[in-house]
């Protein structure tokens, strides 16, 4: 089984499509469907289940032996969200818990970061793939979303 957090969003649903195209048929989406039209993004996909983020750890524990990999794209991605506690809890703390769960259960974990970690790109760093601690320390995210992705 492959789990895609944020799987009903634009990028996540396209990842699900790519996985299906590659022959994967045991896909679970973890996403908060809410009141918007995200359900339309997954309408054409044959997925095993949709799990709300509040229930993900119960689901993981129940199906631990079946899980091959987690693609972690789920996040509050609204760069105008001003509730920093909410963004940090969802994007940093829960990501860390999910990574720990994967580590403890020997499940592959792929984390999607964001260009927002760079900030405005005007520092001496610019946009770089250098992930050394020295270079990462120079990044200056501009909002809670970018900061939450940078910290992880």
Question: Whereabouts are the PLM-identified features?
Answer:
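SDR active-site strand-loop-helix element
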Residues: 5, 30, 70-74, 109-115
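NAD(P)H-binding glycine-rich loop region in Rossmannoid oxidoreductase-like domains
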Residues: 44, 53-90, 119
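Short alpha-helix in the Rossmann-fold core of NAD(P)-dependent oxidoreductases
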Residues: 90-95, 102, 110, 148-149
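A short helix->loop->beta-strand "cap" motif at the edges of active sites that frequently abuts
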Residues: 24, 104-108
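N-terminal Rossmann NAD(P)H-binding glycine-rich loop of SDR-like oxidoreductase domains
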Residues: 2-24
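Glycine-rich phosphate-binding loop and adjoining beta1-alpha1-beta2 segment
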Residues: 28-56
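Active-site Tyr-X1-5-Lys
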Residues: 104, 139-152
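Active-site "gating" loop of Rossmann-like NAD(P)-dependent oxidoreductase/epimerase domains
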Residues: 75-85, 114-143
């Amino acid at each position: 089984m492959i789990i895609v957090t944020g799987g009903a969003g634009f990028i996540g649903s396209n990842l699900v499509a790519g996985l299906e195209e590659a022959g994967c048929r045991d896909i679970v989406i973890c996403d908060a469907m809410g009141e918007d039209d995200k359900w339309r993004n997954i309408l054409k996909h044959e997925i095993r289940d949709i799990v709300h983020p509040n229930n993900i750890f119960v689901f993981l524990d129940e199906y631990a032996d079946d899980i091959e990999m987690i693609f972690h794209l789920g996040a509050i991605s609204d760069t105008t969200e001003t509730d920093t506690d909410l963004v940090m809890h969802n994007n940093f703390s829960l990501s860390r818990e999910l990574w720990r769960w994967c580590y403890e259960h020997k499940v592959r974990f792929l984390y999607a970061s964001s260009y927002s970690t760079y900030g405005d790109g005007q520092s001496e760093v610019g946009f770089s793939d250098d992930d050394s601690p020295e270079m990462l320390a120079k990044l200056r995210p501009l909002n809670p979303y970018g900061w939450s992705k940078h910290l992880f």
